[in-house]
Regions:
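Short, well-ordered beta-strand elements
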Residues: 33-45, 64-70, 137-138
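Bacterial lipoprotein signal-peptidase II cleavage site
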Residues: 7, 20-35
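Short, polar/charged alpha-helical segment
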Residues: 45-67, 76, 80
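Short helix-initiation/N-cap motifs at beta->coil->alpha
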Residues: 68-79, 167-194
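A bilobed periplasmic-binding-protein/Venus flytrap-type ligand-binding module shared by bacterial periplasmic
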Residues: 118-129, 231-244
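Ligand-binding "clamshell"
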Residues: 99-111, 126, 198, 203, ...
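A conserved helix-loop-strand patch within extracytoplasmic ligand-binding domains
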Residues: 111-160, 260
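Sec-dependent bacterial lipoprotein signal peptides
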Residues: 1-22
Length: 275
């Protein structure tokens, strides 16, 4: 079962990366110098792609100097935002952010919701979820929120039943019915698509699915629905930086008609605008 130690260990392991960012200037440079560029930490796909669209097509006319730094993990963007190495980040959902703050004592806050990446169940071995054999192994993300989302997805697909009211805090201990006797392999979220040759199926976050050339709208055996989904990806800053004029400009651009059209055209339903 996932616990605080896993994220805490990851924070320590990510320290070298964060220090590398800090070495480029004082801890307050990125967050407090509103005359310089706004440095945003982001996952490569689709977050950095969306930010680079803004940078290349919209930022100059809005008077925004935007710099994008890519990260492939779900820890360093928050630690870098907390220590001021970057001015903002764009990679996570509100439930993940709340859980991260609680477990790590950070002070990151949401600015605006931008898009939803539907979580999906994928397999190289079966074409339909009900074809999974008894005792099948399912890879799921090991961070608290995405693990809960993964189990909720499997429940929505009719593969298991969870205790009432557990929401995204669900763990395998909350399973009340498991007719296929599924077993679970908990992995860092980025590793789940790479596990597809070794497990019967894997629950993969939308951004990592796209990076792995999976098409969520087409390839997923079970896919999260957008309606009523609390897991939109958001632009976040350290508490106190919400009124930075650069952040306000970026928030407006990220929720513009131009960005909505870019998301619709580029991702064809695999990423959905939240505005």
């Amino acid at each position: 079962v996932r616990n605080t130690a896993k994220i805490t260990t990851a924070v320590l392991a990510a320290g070298a990366l964060t220090l590398g960012l800090s070495a480029c200037g004082s801890d307050q440079d990125a967050a407090s110098d509103t005359s310089g560029p706004l440095v945003v930490a982001a996952s490569p796909v689709p977050h950095a792609e969306i930010l680079n669209f803004v940078k290349d097509n919209l930022a100059e006319d809005a008077g925004l100097d935007l710099e994008v730094k890519e990260f492939t993990d779900y820890v360093t963007p928050n630690t870098a935002t907390e220590d001021g190495s970057v001015g903002a980040n764009y990679f996570q959902t509100q439930p993940y952010l709340d859980d991260f703050n609680k477990k790590n004592g950070t002070h990151i806050v949401s600015v605006v919701d931008v898009h939803l990446e539907p979580l999906g169940l994928y397999s190289h071995k079966v074409k339909k979820a009900d074809e999974l054999k008894s005792g099948a192994t399912i890879a799921i993300p090991n961070d608290t929120v995405n693990e809960g989302r993964a189990l909720q997805l499997l429940a929505a697909g009719g593969l298991l039943t969870l205790k009432d009211g557990v929401g995204t805090s669900a763990t395998p201990a909350d399973i009340t019915e498991n007719p296929k006797k599924l077993t679970f392999k908990e992995l860092e979220a980025a590793q789940t698509p790479r596990s597809l040759d070794d497990v019967d199926a894997a629950v993969v976050n939308g951004n990592y699915a796209i990076e792995a050339d999976l098409k969520p709208a087409k390839d997923a055996l079970v896919l999260e629905e957008a309606k009523g989904n609390p897991n939109s990806n958001l632009l976040a800053v350290k508490e106190g930086q919400e009124n930075d004029p650069r952040v306000k400009k970026l928030a407006k651009l990220l929720t513009s008609p131009e960005v909505k059209k870019f998301i619709e055209d580029k991702y064809a339903g695999s990423v959905l605008a939240s505005f």
